[in-house]
From Swiss-Prot:
The keyword ATP-binding does not apply. GO terms for biological process: aerobic respiration. Belongs to the complex I subunit 1 family. One of its GO terms (cellular component) is plasma membrane. It is a multi-pass membrane protein. It is found in: Cell inner membrane. This is NADH-quinone oxidoreductase subunit H. It is an enzyme of class 7 (translocase). NDH-1 is composed of 14 different subunits. Subunits NuoA, H, J, K, L, M, N constitute the membrane sector of the complex. It catalyses: a quinone + NADH + 5 H(+)(in) = a quinol + NAD(+) + 4 H(+)(out). The chain crosses the membrane at residues 4-24, 75-95, 108-128, 154-174, 181-201, 233-253, 272-292, 308-328. Its EC number is 7.1.1.-.
Length: 336
């Protein structure tokens, strides 16, 4: 029993610590990529090419004073960042990085992830209410409405994948897409693929869906009153969720750790590449897409975001799920 606890704790640390480092350097990549897109240089002072900038940014945040607003609910004010941070990292417990390399290979892995990503909104809403600030409250209410609107579309997209794969286990979904690129689900489930990723951008409150913390309207939204390490927890949760959406999109629609050259003549050339490399390469594409979209599109109005979710994404995903269910039932399509 003790050995199991120690092994599990070690595995958790092997996931969480590298993930936090990736999050730190994802912020560096964001500033660099957007800088180049806007014909700027980006961070280049701290260390060679600015590579130490994330480390010093983290030190700056964690050394700052934690200020508690007057008349705020002190207990809820302190617990809200933890409620946002913990689910964002707990969701990684069921992510397989390669065959057998997973902390907990659940049969209901997708359901667990959906529950964890939905739970993060409680931290945001509590932060908005406990801060005793109208701007925080407005941001929290916007976040709640946005999550409800786009969680449904994401849920329907996941249902389509589950129907196609015949499994809610993440490993089962990846194995169902083995056999080369033509077996990946982004082809037959293309509308669900597009909707899932866009809904993931909205779910993480990233541009152009960042009305939750729209600077020109509500300053910084739900975390306007947070400083130091408490603000850093919200920051770490947001970027961890972005990476989670990227890796889930790779797993559900691009075959996960499967090589695109399976069952082709090129497999003999690329067969030596480990599955984890393919998974990280696909994930990196979507991580870049988050940054590209932010640098390209202006912020949508709140009514436009609601209209897109309720009038376009939800009906589209619902109809496509019905089509997928009928095709699976009739045995149509080479992907199943």
């Amino acid at each position: 029993m003790l050995g199991y606890i120690l092994w599990t704790s070690l595995y958790v640390l092997l996931i969480v610590i590298p993930l936090i480092l990736v999050v730190a350097y994802y912020t560096y990549a964001e500033r660099k990529v957007i800088g180049y897109m806007q014909d700027r240089i980006g961070p280049n002072r701290v260390g060679s090419f600015g590579l130490l900038q994330p480390i010093f940014d983290a030190l700056k945040l964690f050394l700052k004073e934690i200020i508690v607003p007057t008349n705020s609910n002190r207990y809820l004010f302190f617990i809200a960042p933890i409620l946002a941070f913990a689910p964002a990292y707990a969701a990684w417990a069921v992510i397989p990085f390669s065959k057998g390399v997973v902390l907990s290979d659940m049969n209901l892995g997708l359901l667990y992830i959906l529950a964890m990503t939905s739970f993060s909104i409680y931290g945001i809403v509590i932060a908005g209410w406990a801060s005793n600030s109208k701007y925080s409250l407005f941001g929290a209410l916007r976040a709640g409405a946005q999550v409800i609107s786009y969680e449904l579309a994401m849920g329907f997209a996941i249902v389509g994948v589950v129907i196609a794969a015949g499994s809610m286990g993440i490993t089962g979904i990846i194995e169902a897409q083995s056999g080369g690129i033509w077996h990946w689900y982004f082809i037959p489930l293309f509308p669900l693929f597009i909707v899932y990723f866009i809904a993931g951008i909205a779910e993480t409150n990233r541009a152009p869906f960042d009305v939750v913390e729209g600077e020109s309207e509500i300053v910084a939204g739900h975390h306007i009153e947070y400083t130091g390490s408490r603000f850093a927890l919200f920051f770490l949760a947001e970027y961890a969720n972005m990476i989670l959406i990227s890796i889930l999109t790779s797993i559900m629609f691009l075959g996960g750790w499967n090589s695109p050259f399976q069952a082709t003549a090129l497999e003999s050339i690329f067969g030596f590449v480990p599955g984890v490399v393919w998974l990280f390469a696909k994930t990196g594409i979507f991580m870049f897409m988050f940054l590209w979209v932010r640098a390209t599109y202006p912020r949508y109005r709140y009514d436009q975001i609601m209209r897109l979710g309720w009038k376009i994404f939800i009906p589209l995903t619902f109809v496509w799920v019905v089509i997928v269910a009928c095709m699976v039932r009739l045995g149509v399509g080479p992907w199943w």
